[in-house]
Amino acid sequence: PKDSMLLLQVPVY
């Protein structure tokens, strides 16, 4: 889903 792509763009700290 598109949500997955959004998560990839957000840096994981």
Swiss-Prot record:
Q: Identify the keywords attached in UniProt to this record, alphabetized.
A: Amidation, Secreted
A GO-annotated cellular component: extracellular region
Q: In which tissues is it expressed?
A: Follicle, fully grown oocyte and egg.
**Tyrosine amide: residues carrying this PTM:** 13
Where is the protein found, in the record's own terms? Secreted
Keyword Ribonucleoprotein listed? The answer is: no
Q: What does this protein do?
A: Has myotropic activity targeting the genital tract.
Protein's name in the database: SepOvotropin
Q: Which organism is it from?
A: Sepia officinalis
